[in-house]
UniProtKB/Swiss-Prot annotation:
InterPro entries, per the entry: His_Pase_clade-2, His_PPase_superfam
The keyword Transcription regulation is assigned to this record: no
Location of the protein in the cell: Secreted
Source lineage: Eukaryota, Metazoa, Ecdysozoa, Arthropoda, Hexapoda
Protein name from the UniProt record: Acid phosphatase-like protein XcAP-3
Length: 380
């Protein structure tokens, strides 16, 4: 009898403990919606279509709308939200491209369950509200004129040179069809693969020569090159993701102190940040949130497993229990992939915020530090 009573008491304590811990805030970072194939800055000229002339595809719109629906199903009840409202309890933000801004607003429409916004013609003012000045800084590391140190550091990594050699024959085959392709540039391998992948869906007759085996190899190389370029050294982590890490850690600190996420439209009532980024910036964010020793569902992740496909998201959940805060990271590789928990080295799945900060802060840099580091080398 005493044993039974003791068991009930233990279960009651566990239930009370679980009930006391509440999800308070979520950062959702989304890869932007699929768009009409075009030439991408930094890559080869394959389509001769400028990115500014490229619009979201119908499939892309559907993917991010359904993603918004999924995010609502995951978090609406847990966050205590009765109705999603971008002026009150969630903040849709994006990088400065028009496509990304429209993408984040359509994801927000899915969050709200408002189909009428899926094909809405958004005004310039509505799009402008999704961005703020720091967005321009997050992405500058991919510009050799603004951040030569990144390109210099990448060029000095033997593993990157080896990977380029590993897919040289495939890139030479592509070069037969598109002369501007440079097989010696990591960014050309990545952006060539992403462009051909879109063409195989949107303009298949133009790339019949690109076999499935070739595409598989180019994806493998693209994933590996991106991961090496953002994680191989501490300097690469700081240059690629250090600014966005610094910004998020600052936001999290404000939230743990009962303050609003800076710039958020809903102030302290805001519960969710919905950030739409290009694929490369999502990779850079993963790089700083997955330091050496981090695991993905208990395993050391491969570059292929963290390469963001269409509908990829990274969710940063913040829990609070009587003033004690914890953080949980979840990554979805794409729209049809299950969520996998990112566990930091030496931490539980729900990592105490102070410990979370201590593990990651070495990669965080402010704008001045980033500027100085970017300019600390010449390229080429």
């Amino acid at each position: 009898m005493k044993a039974t009573i003791l068991l009930f008491l233990v279960l009651a304590v566990v239930q009370l403990s679980t009930a006391a811990e509440q999800l308070k805030f979520v950062f959702v970072t989304v890869r932007g919606a699929d768009y009409e194939v075009c030439d991408i800055p930094g890559g080869p000229k394959i389509t001769n279509k400028d990115g500014k002339d490229s619009k979201l595809t119908e499939e892309g719109k559907n993917t991010v709308y359904q993603l918004g629906v999924k995010v609502s199903e995951l978090y609406k009840s847990k966050l205590g939200v009765s109705k999603w409202d971008s002026s009150k309890n969630y903040w849709p933000i994006a990088t400065n491209s028009r496509r990304s801004q429209i993408s984040t607003l359509i994801t927000g429409a899915g969050l709200e369950g408002d189909q009428s916004k899926r094909d809405k013609s958004w005004t310039d003012e509505e799009l402008k509200k999704t961005s703020f000045p720091a967005m321009l800084q997050f992405w500058k590391f991919i510009d050799p004129a603004k951040c030569p140190k990144f390109f210099k550091e990448v060029s000095q990594q033997p593993e990157i040179a080896t990977t380029l050699q590993d897919c040289a024959s495939q890139m030479q085959e592509v070069k037969k069809h598109y002369d501007t392709v440079d097989p010696t540039k990591p960014q050309h391998v990545w952006l060539t693969y992403e462009t051909l992948k879109k063409m195989k869906k949107q303009q298949p007759s133009k790339v019949e020569w690109a076999s499935d085996d070739m595409m598989k190899k180019l994806r493998e190389c693209s994933a590996k090159l991106n991961w090496l370029a953002t994680t191989k050294t501490d300097t690469l982590r700081k240059l690629s993701g250090g600014l966005i890490l610094s910004d998020i850690l600052n936001d999290m600190k404000e939230i743990t102190q009962g303050k609003a996420q800076p710039h958020a439209t809903g102030g302290t009532s805001n519960k969710l940040s919905l950030f739409t980024t290009p694929q490369g910036l999502l990779i850079a964010k993963l790089a700083v949130f997955m330091p050496p020793g981090a695991t993905l569902d208990g395993k050391v992740p491969t570059s292929s497993e963290v390469y963001p496909e269409s509908g990829a998201t990274m969710n940063t959940e913040m829990y609070e229990d009587n003033g004690t805060w914890k953080v949980k990271l979840i990554y979805y590789e794409g729209k049809d992939y299950p969520g996998k928990t990112i566990k930091l080295p030496g931490c539980e799945e729900k990592c105490p915020f102070q410990q979370f900060q201590q593990i990651l802060t070495k990669y965080a840099v402010n704008e001045q530090e980033h500027e100085t580091l970017c300019k600390s080398a010449q390229w080429p």
